[in-house]
Curated annotation (Swiss-Prot):
Segments of this protein annotated with the region Disordered: 38-165, 178-224
Gene source species: Rattus norvegicus (Rat)
Cross-referenced CDD domains: CDC_Septin
Effect of G288V: Abolishes the GTP binding
Protein name per UniProt: Septin-9
Source organism phylogeny: Eukaryota, Metazoa, Chordata, Craniata, Vertebrata
Binding, GTP: 285-292, 319, 345, 425-433, 480, 495
Protein family per UniProt: Belongs to the TRAFAC class TrmE-Era-EngA-EngB-Septin-like GTPase superfamily. Septin GTPase family.
Region (G1 motif): 285-292
Residues with the Phosphothreonine modification: T24, T31, T125
Assembly information from the UniProt record: Septins polymerize into heterooligomeric protein complexes that form filaments, and associate with cellular membranes, actin filaments, and microtubules. GTPase activity is required for filament formation. Interacts with SEPTIN2, SEPTIN6, SEPTIN7, SEPTIN11 and SEPTIN14. Interacts with RTKN and ARHGEF18.
Length: 564
């Protein structure tokens, strides 16, 4: 019985032919046959020389008929390992190659049958390997891969594994795939209930698994032969390893739904910074109320008329004169063309009847000049804006109420320009006098129908609360000064007296800071918009109606500049 099994075992090994001398592998170690154990094995191996001319296809068919079990998939790790003790039942995987094996009985060393290493099941748990493993099925025609054979002895040789570079590599272990038999045919042989001594089988069945180390391949390379490559990194636990690192030079992906409408703000800012801004402010009041000083304090520059004009040329005018001076102011890259319009002689005469008419005429003349520039056929690309945007009206700090001149002037000019009333030299009033004086002025404005800026009818929804607070402060009790002092280590603008220093920008001393915020920091653009959209628009409609009626009657009529 035992002899028959040995005979069957030898028949299963009659699968490879002798390889021609020119195709002898460069590294071949042969194992001597155990003639003492098996008596008839020498005769069987001598018969192999006769079968050298048989084709490789016939050998594959012979083995496929004798294969009692399907092929087994196994995973071998790179590196030579000492053989482990095998059980009585051993499963073998035979790698069929089209090359012939040169085998002679007289040559010492084991015969090369191209057998896979026997996989011993249930003895040792494989250790985790930090490298990525790719299972690849070797085709018989692929001869370009490097084959590294382990030595037949149990002690591994030092030169068994080739030394490779330090680049990260993945180990490809060749296993057969039963589902793809036409592409990668690897029929296995199984020995069951073998009672032969293990020492006899090790000489014949010592595995020589072809292990190939290849450099790391990217995703495109792994898709070349999808029928014979199974990438273990496709598992969810290795999905993160396959992701390529993001380059540092790559920009963050732009939102797909982003259009770029918000860039219009930057475009408008660049255009406005290039063109600059224009602001025209008029100061009206009697002489000696500190009009020029307040303007210098507002813009912290010597921009008033008196600051530029020599004192020797200063004289008391017999009539009201309108004088303007223009400055180019730049702060943090923002340029503004500031025009200050002064009205010397207003209210300084004995008879102040109709003293407001020159001021009204000047305001309407600026509207007319701007209108003529608009209606021209070949008008300028940018029309110079000389319209009066704001008028500061200085009220003397009498402590009583408004004078008839003040009421008449503000009543007429509030319809054509933005009027902001201020109490000049408010430091001459006590706190109680200031509160009482402001209440009297507010009641006089309401009783005479004088609508000062900010007008309630022009309020926008988001500015209503802010404008209400400003309206409660009107008229602003201000103090102007262009002298600097050191108070508690800080530089301030103020007025120094025997009893202390009045700080101009201190809201507990005066309301100059609120006036500056209204005119410059919060409402400057709104003041210009109301001038253009409300006051100038009313003047333009009136002039166009007058022009149409004059053309209908055939009469040329001079534009009225006295009053709207």
């Amino acid at each position: 019985m035992e002899r028959d099994r040995i005979t069957a075992l030898k028949r299963s090994f009659e699968v490879e032919e002798i390889e021609p001398p020119n195709s002898t592998p460069p590294r071949r170690v042969q194992t001597p046959l155990l003639r003492a154990t098996v008596a008839s094995s020498s005769q069987k191996f001598q018969d192999l020389g006769v079968k050298n001319s048989e084709p490789a296809a016939r050998l594959v068919d012979t083995l496929s008929q004798r294969s009692p079990k399907p092929s087994l998939r196994r995973v071998d790790l790179a590196g030579a390992k000492a053989p482990e003790p095998m059980s009585r039942r051993t499963e073998l995987s035979i790698d069929i190659s089209s090359k012939q094996v040169e085998s002679t009985a007289s040559t010492p060393g084991p015969s090369r049958f191209g057998l896979k290493r026997a996989e011993v099941l249930g003895h040792k748990t494989p250790e985790p390997v930090p490298r990525r493993t790719e299972i690849t099925i070797v085709k018989p025609q692929e001869s370009g891969l490097r084959r590294v054979e382990t030595p037949a002895s149990k002690a591994p040789e030092g030169s068994a594994m080739p030394v490779t570079d330090a680049a990260p590599k993945r180990v490809e272990i060749q296993v057969p795939k039963p589902a793809e038999a036409p592409n990668c045919p690897l029929p296995p042989q199984t020995l069951e209930n073998s009672e032969a001594p293990m020492s006899q089988l090790q000489s014949r069945l010592e595995p020589r698994p072809p292990v190939t180390e290849v450099p790391y391949r990217n995703q495109e390379d792994s898709e070349v032969a999808p029928s014979c490559v199974v990438d273990m990194a496709d598992n969810p636990r290795d999905a993160m390893l396959k992701q390529a690192p993001v380059s540092r030079n790559e920009k963050a992906p732009v939102d797909f739904g982003y259009v770029g409408i918000d860039s219009i703000l930057e475009q408008m800012r660049r255009k406005a910074m290039k063109q600059g801004f224009e602001f025209n402010i008029m100061v009206v009041g009697q002489s000696g109320l500190g009009k020029s000083t307040l303007i210098n304090t507002l813009f912290k520059s010597k921009i008033s008329r008196k600051s530029v004009q020599p004192i020797s040329e200063e004289r008391i005018p017999k009539t009201i004169e309108i004088k303007s001076i223009t400055h180019d102011i730049e702060e943090k890259g923002v340029r503004m063309k500031l025009t200050v319009i002064d009205t010397p002689g207003f209210g300084d005469h004995i008879n102040n009847e109709n003293c407001w008419q020159p001021i009204m005429k000047f305001i309407n003349d600026q509207y007319e000049k701007y209108l003529q520039e608009e209606v021209n056929i070949n008008r300028k690309k940018r029309i110079p804006d000389t319209r009066v945007h704001c008028c500061l009206y200085f009220i003397p700090a009498t402590g009583h109420s408004l004078r008839p001149l003040d009421i008449e002037f503000m009543k007429r000019l509030s319809k054509v320009v933005n009027i902001v009333p201020v109490i000049a030299k408010a430091d001459t009033l006590t706190l109680e006098e200031r509160v009482y004086f402001k209440q009297r002025i507010t009641s006089d404005l309401l009783s005479n129908g004088i609508d000062v800026y900010p007008q309630k009818e022009f309020d926008e929804a988001e500015d209503r609360l802010v404008n209400e607070k400003f309206r409660e402060m009107i008229p602003f009790a201000v103090v102007g000064s262009d002298h600097e002092y050191q108070v508690n280590g800080k530089r301030i603008l103020g007025r120094k007296t025997k009893w202390g220093t009045i700080e101009v920008e201190n809201t507990t001393h005066c309301e100059f800071a609120y006036l500056r915020d209204l005119l410059i920091r919060t409402h400057m653009q709104n003041i210009k918009d109301i001038t253009s959209n409300i006051h100038f628009e009313a003047y333009r409609v009136k002039r166009l109606n007058e022009g149409n009626s004059a053309m209908a009657n055939g009469i040329e009529k001079e534009p009225e500049t006295q009053e709207m």
